[in-house]
């Protein structure tokens, strides 16, 4: 469960290393975001010569959370940390590689590109 001020790792090669959630999109007073939800983030740490710079405000999709996601069969998939993938204005990933596993819940029309780039889908 990601909320405002939550710090997330970046799971792509866009140049950002760490981002902070500044808004959960989808509803006027929505508090939490889970896996597959879109959030507004600001870049807190970035590498030199990356595609994004520190202080930039971006859109991102949550791909891993410590809270996890519950499946229909009752199983829960949790991760060691919270991670997001940065998106451009067309909701496409900025990076060309995805690091770490992603869940099957991202397998929608919007995020098939992220699922296909990921090394492992749980």
From Swiss-Prot:
Similarity annotation: Belongs to the universal ribosomal protein uL14 family.
Which controlled-vocabulary keywords does the entry list?
A: Ribonucleoprotein, Ribosomal protein, RNA-binding, rRNA-binding
An example Gene Ontology molecular-function term: large ribosomal subunit rRNA binding
User: Pfam families in the record, alphabetically?
Assistant: Ribosomal_L14
Which InterPro entries does this one have?
A: Ribosomal_uL14, Ribosomal_uL14_bac-type, Ribosomal_uL14_CS, Ribosomal_uL14_sf
PANTHER family, sorted:
50S/60S RIBOSOMAL PROTEIN L14/L23, LARGE RIBOSOMAL SUBUNIT PROTEIN UL14M
From the broadest rank down, the organism's phylogenetic lineage runs: Bacteria, Pseudomonadati, Pseudomonadota, Gammaproteobacteria, Pseudomonadales
Q: Which domain of life is it from?
A: Bacteria
- GO cellular component terms given for this protein: cytosolic large ribosomal subunit
**Coding gene?**
rplN
Q: Mind telling me which PROSITE patterns this protein's record contains?
A: RIBOSOMAL_L14
User: Assembly and partners?
Assistant: Part of the 50S ribosomal subunit. Forms a cluster with proteins L3 and L19. In the 70S ribosome, L14 and L19 interact and together make contacts with the 16S rRNA in bridges B5 and B8.
Q: What biological process terms from GO does the record include?
A: translation
Know the name of this protein? Large ribosomal subunit protein uL14
- Task performed by this protein: Binds to 23S rRNA. Forms part of two intersubunit bridges in the 70S ribosome.
Q: Which CDD domains match?
A: Ribosomal_uL14
